[in-house]
Amino acid sequence: MIKLKVKKGDEVIVVTGKYKGKKGKVLKVFIDENTVIVSGVNLVKKHTKPNKMSEGGIITKESPIHISNVAHIDPKTGNPTKVAFKFLEDGSKVRIAKKSGEIIGKVGNDVKI
């Protein structure tokens, strides 16, 4: 199992495939399948039947993409970057961009022991 460094709400860029170079926000992360749904990327058309609640028709929606095909966007430069983990002086664990050293986001309430 791959260690997931991508979280919901992160800004990512697609690095391979049909949507290469397209940027978007992570909408959902599927931990078991190592996939993410990125807004505006990997669009598929789904045919739905009409029922009591909604009309039928063709719906365009995002489909999951493997996490190896996306990379974080460096907050400083706007280019793709790898992610590292670092502990701050107050003991909180954060994700940082390897290229610029900028903080991408906090990991949680983890405390260094």
Swiss-Prot record:
The keyword Mitochondrion does not apply. GO terms for biological process: translation. This is Large ribosomal subunit protein uL24. Belongs to the universal ribosomal protein uL24 family. It comes from Rickettsia typhi (strain ATCC VR-144 / Wilmington). One of two assembly initiator proteins, it binds directly to the 5'-end of the 23S rRNA, where it nucleates assembly of the 50S subunit. GO terms for molecular function: rRNA binding; structural constituent of ribosome. Part of the 50S ribosomal subunit. Pfam families: KOW, ribosomal_L24. Disulfide bonds: none annotated. GO terms for cellular component: ribonucleoprotein complex; ribosome. Keywords: Ribonucleoprotein, Ribosomal protein, RNA-binding, rRNA-binding. CDD domains: KOW_RPL26. NCBIfam families: rplX_bact.
